[in-house]
Amino acid sequence: MRLLKADITKVDNVDAIVNAANTSLLGGGGVDGAIHRVAGPLLLKECRQLNGCEVGQAKITSGYNLPVEYVIHTVGPIWKSGNADESQLLAACYRNSLHLAQKCNIRKIAFPAISTGIYGYPVVEATKIAFQVVKEYVQDNPGDFDLVEFVLFDDSTYNVYLKEIGSNLIEL
């Protein structure tokens, strides 16, 4: 696992980036809006054909004008004080994104901090879930991934990830 403080739309060292999408898959705010803006109108056209995505699930499209071949769209949970299966749904986002990547022979993947922006998921809790799921998935599927990267846009989120990664380092 690797951390990178950057704009995920500019990451060019992976085969796919993960989009923290909404259920319509038609663009929105935060990382979702940025990915749609950079990828261009063909991404929106392909997303329309997917008929949305449920929370915790993942779907794949081409990357279009992005510097990656694919975008894996996943819909994270909206934080509701932890009483609405948010942790299981967030874990499913990471697990299902990795499973879809594996099915499509994607060996290098970059994740944003799913649900921690406008969806309000506490960053520390979200980080622990992300690391745990990725670590377990990669260990259960040895040799299937060359790089799993977390691309974080702001200093505060990056610093939380940096603090939490210590006990979760794994070699791919």
What spans do the regions from the language model cover?
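Phosphate/ribose-phosphate-bearing ligand recognition and processing surfaces
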Residues: 78-172
